[in-house]
């Protein structure tokens, strides 16, 4: 590994400690570029990349949800002037979301997926590709939303095929994929039955093999299993009585694997 690549990794860790996530993204993009000879990222590097983008996108997703909620309230009150201002502001956030998603999707397509050689790294990156297409589908409309949803489905399905063939049901990356795939069915495709079936199957298969779970991934796997169960409880009650509580999804890669 080149010394410049080591330096970028170190700077990314510094940026993470300082909670300067935009700069963390920049440093991790340089790590990917430094490994461009077809060399795969280490597990630590790919987790740092995921944390960087997750924080940068997470802040904007939260902003978008808050602004959209205010917009609905102002519309219901008939405050047209306010609604116009809010729409302009929401568009600014959506431009940032689009730019961030396009940035990581480009890295995934041009470098990361192609260089992945192991089952867990292939699933990790394909899941990531699905996640960022899903984030686009959250706010896009019309044909753009349809395209983002189709890309999400295709990425998650590719990841699922590899996960089912190569990763144990208790593997945290396989569980994290099932968690986010089920959220996609529920939130984007409005298919609560499919969401519940996927989440329940993943949970049941993991429970059946819980005694084989190694100590190193026990904490990560059981955390995601708890999120799967929480969502199942929430969705089942929502199907009987529409709730407003937000879905749980994997927030950080260290909730998925070491």
From Swiss-Prot:
This is 14-3-3-like protein F. One of its GO terms (biological process) is protein localization. It comes from Nicotiana tabacum. Pfam families: 14-3-3. GO terms for cellular component: cytoplasm. Belongs to the 14-3-3 family. Gene3D superfamilies: 14-3-3 domain (1.20.190.20). Transmembrane segments: none annotated. InterPro entries: 14-3-3, 14-3-3_CS, 14-3-3_dom_sf, 14-3-3_domain.
């Amino acid at each position: 590994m080149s010394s410049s690549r080591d330096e970028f990794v170190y700077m990314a860790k510094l940026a993470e400690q300082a909670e300067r996530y935009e700069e963390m993204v920049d440093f991790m993009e340089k790590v990917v570029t430094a490994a461009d000879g077809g060399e795969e990222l280490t597990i630590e590097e790919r987790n740092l990349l995921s944390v960087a983008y997750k924080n940068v996108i997470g802040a904007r997703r939260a902003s978008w949800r808050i602004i959209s909620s205010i917009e609905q309230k102002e519309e219901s009150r008939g405050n047209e002037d306010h609604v116009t201002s809010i729409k302009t502001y929401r568009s600014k956030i959506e431009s940032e979301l689009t730019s961030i998603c396009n940035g990581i999707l480009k890295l995934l397509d041009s470098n990361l997926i192609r260089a992945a050689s192991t089952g867990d790294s292939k699933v990790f990156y394909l899941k990531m590709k699905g996640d960022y297409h899903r984030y686009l589908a959250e706010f896009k409309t019309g044909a753009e939303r349809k395209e983002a949803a189709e890309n999400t489905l295709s990425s998650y399905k590719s990841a699922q095929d590899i996960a089912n063939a190569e990763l144990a049901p208790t593997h945290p990356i396989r569980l994290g994929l099932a968690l986010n795939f089920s959220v996609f069915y529920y939130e984007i495709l409005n298919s609560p039955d499919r969401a519940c079936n996927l989440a329940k199957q993943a949970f049941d298969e993991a429970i059946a093999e819980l005694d084989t779970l190694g100590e190193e991934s026990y904490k990560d796997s059981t955390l995601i299993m708890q999120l799967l169960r929480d969502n199942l409880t929430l969705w089942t009650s929502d199907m009987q009585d529409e709730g407003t509580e937000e879905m749980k999804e994997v927030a950080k890669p260290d909730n998925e694997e070491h």
